[in-house]
Amino acid sequence: MATVNQLVRKPRLRKIVKTNVPALEGSPQKRGVCTRVYTTTPKKPNSALRKVCRVRLTNGFEVTAYIGGEGHNLQEHSVILIRGGRVKDLPGVRYHIVRGSLDCAGVKERKKGRSKYGVKKAKV
């Protein structure tokens, strides 16, 4: 147990919490512009062509973001919104694109889990 005098001379160190999404700088989302839209392959044992894009954010960061859902309308110079959330089988992809916001359209024909893919309730 440290004495009061020892603590005055050298206070206890605070734990440093490292963020998993540094480009967001504490914000829930950030806006950015697509600089490159492409597909990439996941780590073993998975196999697919995952849709990702390189994004230049408003704060100057350049990050790789995952495009979720079936089909998308993104191309170079599309303005998009990104949120945190990594893709476990894609190394270096720590952000997701928010579907149904700005230039990114929602997923067509989506019936379940609509809120995650920017789809309005279907008219009956």
UniProtKB/Swiss-Prot annotation:
One Pfam family in the UniProt entry: Ribosom_S12_S23
Show the CDD domains listed in the entry.
Ribosomal_S12
Free-text function comment from the UniProt entry: With S4 and S5 plays an important role in translational accuracy.
Gene Ontology molecular function terms on file? rRNA binding; structural constituent of ribosome; tRNA binding
How this chain assembles, per its entry, is: Part of the 30S ribosomal subunit. Contacts proteins S8 and S17. May interact with IF1 in the 30S initiation complex.
Q: Which family does it belong to?
A: Belongs to the universal ribosomal protein uS12 family.
Enumerate the InterPro entries for this protein: NA-bd_OB-fold (IPR012340), Ribosomal_uS12 (IPR006032), Ribosomal_uS12_bac (IPR005679)
**NCBIfam families assigned to the protein according to its UniProt record, in alphabetical order:** rpsL_bact
Cellular component, GO annotation? small ribosomal subunit
Query: Keywords assigned by UniProt?
Result: Methylation, Ribonucleoprotein, Ribosomal protein, RNA-binding, rRNA-binding, tRNA-binding
GO biological-process terms attached to the record: translation
Residues bearing the modification 3-methylthioaspartic acid: D89
Q: What is this protein called?
A: Small ribosomal subunit protein uS12
Q: What is the lineage of its organism?
A: Bacteria, Pseudomonadati, Pseudomonadota, Gammaproteobacteria, Enterobacterales
